[in-house]
Amino acid sequence: MAQSSLRLVENPTMDKDKSKAIDAALAQIERAFGKGSIMRLGKGDKVQEVETISTGSLGLDVALGVGGLPRGRVIEIYGPESSGKTTLALHTIAEAQKKGGVCAFVDAEHALDPVYARKLGVNLDDLLISQPDTGEQALEITDTLVRSGAIDVLVVDSVAALTPRAEIEGEMGDQQPGLQARLMSQALRKLTGSISRSNCMVIFINQIRMKIGVMYGSPETTTGGNALKFYASVRLDIRRVSTLKDRDEPIGNSVRVKVVKNKVAPPFKQVEFDIMFGEGVSKVGELIDLGVKAGIVEKSGAWFSYDSQRLGQGRENAKGFLRDNPDIAGRIEAAIRQNMGLVADKILENAVPTAEDFDEGEA
């Protein structure tokens, strides 16, 4: 017995009824909650490119896929001690200030070095700083600043130092499990809407801890519970790779940053760059490394050259040349930014996601 084929018949009357029902629902919602509480995404002014602020590292800006860290989002930077977490956050503040932005630093660790911050380009006269006594006070100050709508970048350093009031007022050794996780969860529920509306970037610096008794997978975890992992649009894992030396004298660290989570571009890219002691991110070093990857800077043996002009023999000499010739460095940077897609592909070639990446970035 032959089966008759089913045919889908369009019903114009049904489409009209649906349209009327949707319009009635939209009108009811706007009467109840105000104009603009619901709209068609393509009709409003909300459809726009992601606004970003540079991290101070050209390579990391490329790896993030949108040219920097996104505004109006929660960002988490975590890693071991002395890996460059605060340095990266201060560079972001400096870049925002260059564009006329207002920035704040909630120093829960009470460890901000203003001399070092100034060396990184931070304008201390315009930087708002708070050194709160408790975690509740720190997050209340953060909430007030974000709701003001006047802050462009706010850094909380660090989540691990946000000590709940009950823990401070209690005795040393008292067991109070989950206090910090509950505090962070409640704070992020309140903050997330204000952050989006005010277009303020909030950077949480976090530390890592070791989970006891883990047999398989990474034993590392971040402090403050799981809420921050979910609310963060970008999570950066920064690690120190090696120590840079001039003869036998340490002059800086080579660090690797992995984009563990990214809601605005493809994740799992990683990049390496130098952080020099007392100077911060070595921008000229990045120009050479990324320029070679993109084919903009030519390398022949130990010699580096750009546009038929020799930059120097050896990486350090080439860095010195670019430091003394900022106009040439600017042209190389502009060429790299124009070829950002090509550079990102080169970065991605060396960044194959592992099972640990998916475990960390699934939130």
Swiss-Prot record:
InterPro entries in UniProt: AAA+_ATPase (IPR003593), DNA_recomb/repair_RecA (IPR013765), DNA_recomb/repair_RecA_CS (IPR020584), P-loop_NTPase (IPR027417), RecA-like_C (IPR049261), RecA-like_N (IPR049428), RecA_ATP-bd (IPR020588), RecA_C_sf (IPR023400)
Q: Which CDD domains match?
A: RecA (cd00983)
Q: Which Gene3D superfamilies would you find in this protein's record?
A: P-loop containing nucleotide triphosphate hydrolases (3.40.50.300)
The yes or no answer to whether the keyword Nucleotide-binding is present is: yes
Which keywords fit this entry according to its UniProt record? Answer: ATP-binding, Cytoplasm, DNA damage, DNA recombination, DNA repair, DNA-binding, Nucleotide-binding, SOS response
Q: According to its record, what are the GO cellular component terms?
A: cytosol
S-S pairs: none
Tell me, which GO biological process terms does this entry list? DNA recombination; DNA repair; SOS response
A Gene Ontology molecular function term for this protein is:
ATP binding
The record's SUPFAM superfamilies line, in alphabetical order, gives: P-loop containing nucleoside triphosphate hydrolases, RecA protein, C-terminal domain
Recorded protein name is Protein RecA
Upper lineage is: Bacteria, Pseudomonadati, Pseudomonadota, Alphaproteobacteria, Hyphomicrobiales
Q: Which gene encodes it?
A: recA
